[in-house]
């Protein structure tokens, strides 16, 4: 080692510093990493956010991760972003699937207080009608219809009944926990399930004191998350007037609903109608479904109730009629 280099090494050992201009004092340049866009870290908290978003929205892990990356880890904004993207995809799919037959689906019946609603949502296959996501769509439509009815003014002395067609139903607000309209919820469901779907129709009834609504859904199953909502393929509401509150009114109402579903009357008729002829389509003069030896009127009379109106929905009945024409 040269004398000059030996002196430099000795100086560093004694003072801990380098002489000016020495190559030994130069340190490696810092390294930098650049990212083309936001990146979700692999930390435990990020994984927890990803799982939470996945559980809340039901979208794939890939899409949830992309949403969190796009929104910088903001859970609320990521959820909004996901819904917007899903809606875009849903509208695109809806346009492609428009015109395909929707003979399957579900009827939904929901009762709250003095208000009862009956809704029909159609899809292409029975397989999709049994899917949880489709059932949640029917639930949302029933809730949206119920909210609409609750904004209407009550009639103090008479019942009120109304119908909503597909266009009117689509324009209703989606509900307290959803943004946009029912049409937006429909687009989301189409995007997720990949079938053509239609918000077919809805009926609602509001009754004052002295009236009650009997109801029945055939092939009934409970909604996955709303115990008051009943789902099935046929549904009926029967509006009755009674002067006294009896304990068996609910059972009588269910039996009347069964009759309407099974016998498909076209009108109520009167107790004076004779059986046969045109009376066969009148509810009170039809043979009682559960005991054909008597008419429905003969069953009702001793129960202390008067049948004043009814609504009957059969899933896909409009589609079937169109095919036979």
UniProtKB/Swiss-Prot annotation:
Gene3D superfamilies reported for this sequence: DNA helicase RuvA subunit, C-terminal domain, Elongation factor Ts, dimerisation domain
GO molecular function: RNA binding; translation elongation factor activity
Modified sites of kind Phosphothreonine: 324
InterPro entries recorded: EF-Ts_dimer_sf, Transl_elong_EFTs/EF1B, Transl_elong_EFTs/EF1B_dimer, Transl_elong_Ts_CS, UBA-like_sf
Keywords assigned by UniProt, alphabetized: Cardiomyopathy, Disease variant, Elongation factor, Mitochondrion, Phosphoprotein, Primary mitochondrial disease, Protein biosynthesis, Transit peptide
Compartments, record wording: Mitochondrion
Protein task: Associates with the EF-Tu.GDP complex and induces the exchange of GDP to GTP. It remains bound to the aminoacyl-tRNA.EF-Tu.GTP complex up to the GTP hydrolysis stage on the ribosome.
Record's disease association: Combined oxidative phosphorylation deficiency 3: A mitochondrial disease resulting in severe metabolic acidosis with encephalomyopathy or with hypertrophic cardiomyopathy. Patients show a severe defect in mitochondrial translation leading to a failure to assemble adequate amounts of three of the oxidative phosphorylation complexes.
Family under the similarity heading: Belongs to the EF-Ts family.
Protein name listed in UniProt: Elongation factor Ts, mitochondrial
Organism: Homo sapiens (Human)
Taxonomic path: Eukaryota, Metazoa, Chordata, Craniata, Vertebrata
